[in-house]
Design a protein with these regions (language model features):
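Sec-dependent N-terminal signal peptides of Gram-positive bacterial secreted proteins and lipoproteins
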Residues: 6-24
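Sec-dependent signal peptide cleavage junction
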Residues: 19-39
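Histidine-centered active-site loop/cap adjacent to the catalytic His
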Residues: 47-51, 231-281
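Oxyanion-hole/transition-state-stabilizing segment in secreted/luminal serine hydrolases
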Residues: 87-89, 95, 99, 135-169
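Active-site segments of SGNH/GDSL-like serine hydrolases
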Residues: 157-161, 170-205, 209
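Extracellular serine-dependent O-acyl
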Residues: 187-190, 198-235, 248-263
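Glycan-recognition and processing domains
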Residues: 263-328
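Conserved small/polar residues in nucleotide/adenosyl-binding loops
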Residues: 334-341
C-alpha cells in the first residue's frame, strides 16, 4: 500500500468514530497514567492490518488521559443539555492555515464533540488560534480571547511555535494554571514540524505534573514516518501546517480521545497541585489595550493599530520628534508587545 492510500485509510477508519473505538477498546484505567515503556526483553509486535496500524497510531498519540473526571463531568453536562463551550488556543495550526476555518482540526473536533455529546445547539465553539504566536503571547491573549467566553474545555497548541527556553516554559505553565484555577479542563495537543521541531518534552512534564489529558500527533507521526506508513508530504504542503487531509488525521486522534475517555475509570474530583514545575509568574495576566489603559502622554504615538487582532493599541508615528509614550500603572511584572507595521 502506498503512503497516500495509507493516509486515506487512516482517516476513513478514524471517522467511523465510536463504532471503531468500541472494538478492542484499550481505554482501561491503566491509560489514565502516561503509558509506560515496554519491557526491553519483550519484542514489540508490529501491526499488520490497516485497522491495527490505525489503532497503533492512536496509541502513540494518546500520551495520557490525565484525571478523567474533569472531561467526564463536561461531557455529562453537554449530554444533559446544559451550555458547554469548547475553546482552542494556539497558533496558525489551530487558526486553520492550509485547511481553512471549517477544515481545521479545531472545527472538526468541535463538530464531533457537539454531535456526539450535545443535544442541539448547546455546545459552543471558540477558536483563539492566531498565526505566528507562541505561549508567551498566548498567556496575554488568554483573558480576552478565551476566558471571556467562559469555556469548559480549552485545547492548547503551541508546541511548534514555542522554544524551549524558560520564558516559554513559564508562560505555558501559566496558561495551564490559569485555566485550572477557573475550573476549565485543559487538553494539551502537541504538534511537530517537518524538521522535527516540537517543544512537547517540557509540555509533557507540565501535563504529567498536573495530570492532564495529552494528545501528541507529533509522536503519532514520528511512528508512522519511522515505519514508512506515510511521509511528511502526505501530511503537509509546507514545513509546519497540516494540509486538509492532515487536519482530518489530527482530528481523528482527538476524536479517539472523545470516544474513549468515558470508558476510563474516574479518579475523583480534581485537585490542582500547589507546587509548580517551573515559575508560572504570568498566572492571571491581563492584556491592556486602548480601551482599558490610557497613556499619560502619547508622545510620538497615535491611538489605534492594525496588526492582526490587535486593533486597539497605539502606533508609532516616525514623522514626530521620537518622544516616548508614557503610562502610569502598578504591576508585579509587565510585558510590552511591539509589532512591526510592515
Amino acid at each position: 500500500m502506498n503512503t497516500k492510500k495509507m493516509l486515506a485509510v487512516l482517516v476513513s477508519v478514524a471517522m467511523c468514530g465510536a463504532a471503531f473505538a468500541g472494538c478492542g477498546n484499550n481505554a482501561d484505567s491503566s491509560k489514565a497514567e502516561s503509558k509506560a515503556e515496554s519491557s526491553s526483553s519483550q519484542v514489540e509486535k508490529m501491526p499488520e492490518t490497516d485497522e491495527e496500524w490505525t489503532q497503533a497510531m492512536y496509541d502513540k498519540a494518546m500520551v495520557s488521559y490525565g484525571n478523567t473526571s474533569m472531561m467526564q463531568n463536561v461531557i455529562k453536562k453537554a449530554q444533559s443539555g446544559e451550555k458547554v463551550t469548547v475553546a482552542y488556543l494556539g497558533g496558525s495550526i489551530t487558526e486553520g492555515i492550509s485547511a481553512g476555518a471549517d477544515g481545521c482540526y479545531a472545527k472538526l473536533t468541535y463538530d464531533y464533540f457537539a454531535q456526539k455529546f450535545g443535544t442541539g445547539d448547546n455546545v459552543q465553539y471558540v477558536n483563539a488560534g492566531l498565526s505566528g504566536t507562541p505561549s508567551k503571547l498566548g498567556i496575554l491573549r488568554l483573558d480576552r480571547d478565551v476566558l471571556a467566553y467562559e469555556p469548559d474545555i480549552c485545547f492548547i497548541e503551541f508546541a511548534v511555535n514555542d522554544g524551549t527556553e524558560t520564558d516559554y516554559q513559564n508562560a505555558y505553565e501559566s496558561i495551564v494554571r490559569t485555566l485550572l484555577q477557573k475550573n476549565i479542563t485543559p487538553v494539551l495537543l502537541f504538534s511537530v514540524t517537518e524538521n522535527d521541531h516540537s517543544a512537547q518534552d517540557y509540555m509533557k512534564q507540565i501535563g504529567e505534573f498536573y495530570h492532564l489529558p495529552m494528545i501528541s500527533y507529533c509522536d503519532a507521526l514520528r511512528y508512522l514516518f519511522a515505519n514508512n506508513r506515510m511521509t511528511w508530504k502526505d501530511f503537509s504542503d509546507d514545513q509546519s501546517h497540516p494540509n486538509t487531509e492532515g487536519h482530518k488525521l489530527v482530528a481523528s486522534m482527538v476524536d479517539y480521545y472523545f470516544d474513549t475517555v468515558m470508558d476510563v475509570a474516574p479518579e475523583g474530583d480534581y485537585v490542582m497541585p500547589t507546587d509548580t514545575v517551573f515559575s508560572p509568574r504570568e498566572v492571571d495576566a491581563h492584556m491592556y489595550e486602548g480601551d482599558s489603559l490610557t497613556p499619560t502622554s502619547l508622545g510620538s504615538w497615535k491611538e489605534g493599530s492594525t496588526i492582526a487582532s490587535f486593533t486597539n493599541g497605539w502606533t508609532y508615528d516616525n514623522t514626530g520628534d521620537n518622544s516616548p509614550i508614557v503610562f502610569d500603572f502598578k504591576a508585579v511584572s509587565y510585558t510590552h508587545l511591539t509589532l512591526p507595521t510592515n
